Amino acid sequence: MDKKKRILVKFSGEALAGDSGFGIDSTILKFIANEIKSLVDMGVEVGIVIGGGNIIRGVSAAAGGIIKRTSGDHMGMLATVINAIAMREALEFYDVDVRVQSAIKMEAICETFIIGRAKRHLEKGRVVIFAAGTGNPFFTTDTAATLRAIEIESDMIIKATKVNGVYDKDPNKFEEAVLLNSLTYDEALKDNIKVMDDTAIALAKDNHLPIVVCNMFKSGNLCKIADDDLSFCSIVK
């Protein structure tokens, strides 16, 4: 690795749930914590954003017509705080110095997000987990992750998924799906290419933030990316 990198890693809440589809699987939590620890041990400055879909999604909560979408999204933000606390505990278990910063004030649980403070934590080698999305309804955690990556001047954002990268079609449905090692932001915005939501991609494009998509369940992938090996994944730039 030529220089010290600053990377933001985004993964979904569903990833924490494992096969059960709900809640937090301690085995997966330990695995992710170890992968993040390996990055820290390389000298990489690491930020994290976790979704909340393993607990609740704002859109789903509002689908019944009783809960307003804004309230549903606030519930989703709280779910990301739950996941952030779990990840903090897992990282601390492995002696990683970590802070949680929330877009919504909740001082009894974690810090409130302040850009300068987040950067200082990163410079001191602490992992920073950004929770509660952007703090606003109608914005996804993908958009929140992209925003935080730009704010902390990250070199890239890694979207850690269950597949090896971006495909020209859904690899779970089509055996002939082809992995795209490199694509432009405009190509990523096409309807059949699912990288992130359009707002997140447009934000990354406007700020020249590379998006790397990889399989989070293959040990060592994050470290390879930090060491500039992108042969096994996809990059949007």
From Swiss-Prot:
<feature type="binding site">
    <location>
        <begin position="134"/>
        <end position="141"/>
    </location>
    <ligand>
        <name>UMP</name>
    </ligand>
</feature>
<feature type="binding site">
    <location>
        <position position="170"/>
    </location>
    <ligand>
        <name>ATP</name>
    </ligand>
</feature>
<dbReference type="Pfam" id="PF00696">
    <property type="entry name" value="AA_kinase"/>
</dbReference>
<keyword id="KW-0808">Transferase</keyword>
<dbReference type="GO" id="GO:0005524">
    <property type="term" value="F:ATP binding"/>
</dbReference>
<feature type="binding site">
    <location>
        <position position="52"/>
    </location>
    <ligand>
        <name>UMP</name>
    </ligand>
</feature>
<dbReference type="GO" id="GO:0006225">
    <property type="term" value="P:UDP biosynthetic process"/>
</dbReference>
<feature type="binding site">
    <location>
        <position position="57"/>
    </location>
    <ligand>
        <name>ATP</name>
    </ligand>
</feature>
<keyword id="KW-0665">Pyrimidine biosynthesis</keyword>
<keyword id="KW-0021">Allosteric enzyme</keyword>
<feature type="binding site">
    <location>
        <position position="167"/>
    </location>
    <ligand>
        <name>ATP</name>
    </ligand>
</feature>
<feature type="binding site">
    <location>
        <begin position="10"/>
        <end position="13"/>
    </location>
    <ligand>
        <name>ATP</name>
    </ligand>
</feature>
<keyword id="KW-0547">Nucleotide-binding</keyword>
<comment type="function">
    <text>Catalyzes the reversible phosphorylation of UMP to UDP.</text>
</comment>
<dbReference type="InterPro" id="IPR011817">
    <property type="entry name" value="Uridylate_kinase"/>
</dbReference>
<feature type="binding site">
    <location>
        <position position="161"/>
    </location>
    <ligand>
        <name>ATP</name>
    </ligand>
</feature>
<keyword id="KW-0418">Kinase</keyword>
<dbReference type="GO" id="GO:0005829">
    <property type="term" value="C:cytosol"/>
</dbReference>
<protein>
    <recommendedName>
        <fullName>Uridylate kinase</fullName>
        <ecNumber>2.7.4.22</ecNumber>
    </recommendedName>
</protein>
<dbReference type="GO" id="GO:0044210">
    <property type="term" value="P:'de novo' CTP biosynthetic process"/>
</dbReference>
<comment type="similarity">
    <text>Belongs to the UMP kinase family.</text>
</comment>
<dbReference type="InterPro" id="IPR015963">
    <property type="entry name" value="Uridylate_kinase_bac"/>
</dbReference>
<keyword id="KW-0067">ATP-binding</keyword>
<dbReference type="InterPro" id="IPR036393">
    <property type="entry name" value="AceGlu_kinase-like_sf"/>
</dbReference>
<comment type="pathway">
    <text>Pyrimidine metabolism; CTP biosynthesis via de novo pathway; UDP from UMP (UMPK route): step 1/1.</text>
</comment>
<dbReference type="InterPro" id="IPR001048">
    <property type="entry name" value="Asp/Glu/Uridylate_kinase"/>
</dbReference>
<feature type="region of interest" description="Involved in allosteric activation by GTP">
    <location>
        <begin position="18"/>
        <end position="23"/>
    </location>
</feature>
<feature type="binding site">
    <location>
        <position position="73"/>
    </location>
    <ligand>
        <name>UMP</name>
    </ligand>
</feature>
<feature type="binding site">
    <location>
        <position position="53"/>
    </location>
    <ligand>
        <name>ATP</name>
    </ligand>
</feature>
<keyword id="KW-0963">Cytoplasm</keyword>
<dbReference type="GO" id="GO:0033862">
    <property type="term" value="F:UMP kinase activity"/>
</dbReference>
<comment type="subunit">
    <text>Homohexamer.</text>
</comment>
